[in-house]
Curated annotation (Swiss-Prot):
Superkingdom of this protein's organism: Bacteria
Any Gene Ontology biological process: fatty acid beta-oxidation
Subunit composition and interactions: Heterotetramer of two alpha chains (FadB) and two beta chains (FadA).
Keyword RNA-binding appears in the UniProt entry: no
PROSITE patterns referenced in this protein's UniProt entry, alphabetically: 3HCDH (PS00067), ENOYL_COA_HYDRATASE (PS00166)
EC number of this enzyme: 4.2.1.17, 5.1.2.3, 5.3.3.8, 1.1.1.35
Record-annotated active site: H450 (for 3-hydroxyacyl-coa dehydrogenase activity)
Originating species: Photobacterium profundum (strain SS9)
Protein name listed in UniProt: Fatty acid oxidation complex subunit alpha
Length: 720
């Protein structure tokens, strides 16, 4: 044994060939601070070996290295820039030490080699992958860029264009694609990886493979003439500007760093990478995107825990076919849980099966599934007019029409047709779970399961706990939602649950702006282009459906009359009266036509201004900051109230529900990350300026107290 550390070891195999084996405690290998130090110590030991002829790097895990330990990021990013620079320099000194070993080096890659894992294999002379390998640099998706030499070595290995595509997209490459690009030298079967790696390193030792030429290429400037460089970097910047936009600076910064270092040697180029990495690490965007990653891991961790605690779902029932029921049935069957889809009408069952078939055909066309998988999924959905077969179901998801009396009747009926241990969940967006539970004999087996439309695309599922819901029920439904590929977030029962409860104060802010003379097209433009929502409020209302929103607003007003009741007629009322229901019937705040791909196309409708004139104030030119403040303060206040009232358990879950359920701009991180970034005292001062507008603008007491104490909602990281 040459070296034995906590996360890796080095030993001789035969004839002067050493193996550096990555085998950290836990499920995966990460390039955390500890592993970097172990690598440094291992390399120091290797430099002392006079008999060393070659080095293989291997992994004992299913994945080579999944990347850096992102839980360390926020702590590192909070350090002074000089200290962060020193850490990066030290890390790169270690990778340079690997690259500069006086013998040929080879990485034998199995599974994922991402981020720091990819940068590690780039530092070796050769890369051999098995067919399961996926290699990439996802850092730009976290608001940063590669910092362990990725922007230096990858362009010198692949050429600037291919390297910039990989780095700016942040997506990994399958083994065969990596081979075509030249990112790996060969791809073999998993069982052949070790022997093939030994054979290749022996060829390098024997001089059959020129490892020194390979190494020299990675340490030299890029081989681009001035005209080629100008064309390459100009096109890359134009593409990145179009795709990433102004709110996500990391991809553009990576391109700028590669361009600035193009004519430099490795060591000079690493200094450039260091500087640009630090610039990004200090941005609010990086804090937000890293925070989202950590929050997502926290939610996944809770779902895994629930899966261990609750019995697995082997069979489900969906009550109510149609688009929503068909979508739920499809998602369940796709992920391996067969379902009985029950309805009272054959046309509805046909519609549900057609919805599932349509979604599967899209997957087939895109090459994501084959015909065998499609047939298997469809055979996993059994349409039925009867309850026969439901008696052994683990979970029932009721998805009938959004009417409390109908739902209550259906729930009582299904309860009498299933076992005493079957969990029943209602897919409802507005009806209180405690109200529906009154129709059941076993309310402890009942909860809400609010899917978002379209089911196959929207990641969030709200799991609603009623007064009598057992923890066993919650665990089983959370585990089922996770099995379906969703992000389940548990909330307590209240009008609108969490997502709709916080959405309608936002719509109230919109109505008040219009009442005070704002132009709804300007409001939409500001909230999309400046704040970063995928849709402005008018467009969102059209997509949700004006009739749906009008009904939900009445429910919210009944539940929270002080804040959400209104004593004036607003723009949504006018749209509803005029039966302009939005995209569903072609007219709402905007008019809709069908584009060449069959998708709704939004158009300005001149008739709307005249229709709204009676409820609009005198035209007023609001600044972008005023529009953002007046739109966001009501939502922020309601989100905080939900936390204070224990409707939602943590800031992390609240922020992820907003990002996954409403499309809250990821670069802002969610409401709690956003107000932490603003500063709670600054937020309170801003909100107080608008307090005269009504109760939705009044800052919750708990938030005001935290602001006075100088506190924030997040510490540096969320622990799963």
């Amino acid at each position: 044994m040459i070296y034995q550390g906590e996360t890796l070891s080095v030993r001789y195999l035969d004839d002067g060939i050493a193996e550096l084996n990555l085998n950290a405690p836990g499920a995966v290998n990460k390039f955390d601070l500890k592993t970097l130090e172990c690598l440094n110590e291992a390399l120091n030991a290797l430099y002392q070996q006079s008999d060393l002829k070659g080095l293989l790097i291997t992994s004992d895990k299913d994945a080579f290295i999944v990347g850096a330990d992102i839980t360390e990021f926020l702590g590192l990013f909070a350090k002074p820039a000089e200290e962060l620079s020193q850490w990066l320099t030290r890390a790169n000194d270690i990778f340079n030490k690997l690259e500069d070993l006086p013998v040929p080096t080879l990485s034998a890659i199995n599974g994922h080699a991402l981020g720091g894992g990819c940068e590690c294999v780039l530092a070796t002379d050769f890369r051999l992958a098995d067919i399961t390998a996926r290699i990439g640099l996802p850092e730009t998706r976290l608001g940063i860029m590669p910092g362990f030499g990725g922007t230096v070595r990858l362009p010198r290995l692949l050429g600037a264009d291919s390297a910039m595509e990989i780095i700016t997209a942040g997506k990994d490459k399958k083994a065969q694609d990596a081979l075509k690009l030249g990112l790996v030298d060969a791809v073999v079967a998993p069982t052949a990886l070790k022997d093939a790696a030994l054979s290749m390193i022996k060829d390098a030792i024997a001089g059959k493979l020129d490892w020194q030429k390979r190494r020299a290429q990675k340490k030299a400037p890029l081989t681009l003439n001035k005209i080629e460089a100008t064309m390459s970097f100009t096109m890359a910047k134009a593409m990145v500007a179009q795709v990433a936009g102004k709110h996500y600076p990391a991809p553009m910064t990576a391109v700028i760093a590669i361009e600035a270092a193009a004519r430099m040697s490795r060591d000079e180029a690493l200094v450039v990478e260091n500087k640009h990495f630090i610039t990004l690490a200090k941005t609010d965007v990086a804090q937000s995107l890293v925070g989202i990653f950590l929050n997502d891991q926290y939610i996944k961790g809770k779902a895994k825990k629930a899966a261990k605690e609750g019995q697995p779902t082997k069979k489900g029932v969906v009550l109510g076919a149609g688009i929503m029921g068909g979508g739920i049935a499809y998602q369940s069957a796709l992920k391996g849980v067969p379902v009985l889809m029950k309805d009272i009408a054959v046309p509805s069952l046909d519609l549900g099966m057609a919805e599932a078939a349509k979604l599967l055909n899209k997957q087939l066309e895109r090459g994501r599934i084959d015909g065998v998988k499609m047939a298997k999924v469809l055979s996993g959905i059994t349409p039925s007019l009867h309850y026969a077969g439901a008696e052994d179901a683990d979970i029932v998801v009721e998805a009938v029409v959004e009417n409390p009396k109908i739902k209550a009747a259906v729930l009582a009926e299904v309860e009498s047709n299933v076992s005493d241990t079957t969990v029943i969940a209602s897919n409802t967006s507005t009806i209180p779970i405690n109200l529906l539970a009154q129709s059941l004999k076993r309310p402890e087996n009942f909860c809400g399961m609010h899917f978002f439309n379209p089911v196959h695309r929207m990641p969030l599922v709200e799991i609603i706990r009623g007064e009598h819901t057992s923890e066993e029920t919650i665990s089983r439904v959370v585990a089922y939602a996770a099995k379906m590929g969703k992000s389940p977030i548990v909330v307590n029962d209240c009008p609108g649950f969490f997502v709709n409860r916080v959405l309608f104060p936002y719509f109230a802010g919109f109505s008040l702006l219009l009442r005070d003379g704002a132009d709804f097209t300007q409001v939409d433009k500001v909230m999309e282009k400046q704040f970063g929502w995928p849709m402005g409020p008018a467009y969102l209302l059209d997509v949700v459906g004006i009739d749906t929103a009008h009904h939900a607003q009445a429910v919210m007003a009944e539940g929270f009359p002080d804040r959400m009741g209104k004593n004036y007629k607003d723009a949504v009322d006018v749209m509803f009266e005029q039966q302009r229901f939005g995209q569903k019937n072609g007219n709402g705040f905007f008019a809709y036509s069908v584009d060449r791909r069959g998708k709704p196309k939004k158009n300005v409708d001149p008739a709307v201004a005249e229709l709204l004139a009676p409820v609009l104030g005198a035209a007023t030119d609001f600044t972008s900051d005023e529009i953002i403040a007046r739109m966001m303060i009501p939502m922020i206040n309601e989100v905080v109230r939900c936390l204070e009232e224990c409707i939602i358990a943590t800031p992390a879950e609240a922020d992820m529900a907003l990002v996954y359920g409403l499309g809250f701009p990821p670069f802002r991180g969610g409401v709690f990350r956003y107000i932490d970034t603003l500063g709670l005292a600054e937020y309170v001062a801003m909100a107080d300026k608008f307090a005269h507008l009504g109760a939705v603008y009044e800052v919750p007491t708990g938030l005001r107290e935290k602001a006075a104490k100088g506190e924030s909602y997040y510490t540096q990281q969320v622990n799963a």
